[in-house]
UniProtKB/Swiss-Prot annotation:
This is Large ribosomal subunit protein bL31. Binds 1 zinc ion per subunit. It comes from Brevibacillus brevis (strain 47 / JCM 6285 / NBRC 100599). Pfam families: Ribosomal_L31 (PF01197). Binds the 23S rRNA. It comes from the Bacteria. The gene is rpmE.
Length: 65
């Protein structure tokens, strides 16, 4: 196998737009993300369930059933 062909794997600080920072591993020097597990609705429990409704629901609304 060839020596020294792989990029250096660093421990980097990942910073989120919400202000949360944590360490991870990457070949980059620093990472910036827009959303993390600290502010994502799935992890915070502030999910909104959107039910678009199907064809049957539209039919019932159209004919007041």
């Amino acid at each position: 196998m060839k020596q020294d062909i792989h990029p250096k794997y660093n421990v980097v600080t990942v910073s989120c737009a919400c202000g949360n920072e944590f360490e991870s591993g990457s070949v980059k020097q620093a990472l910036k993300v827009e959303i993390c597990s600290n502010c994502h609705p799935f992890f915070t429990g502030k999910q909104k369930f959107v039910d678009a409704g199907g064809r049957v629901d539209r039919f019932k609304r159209k004919y007041n059933l």
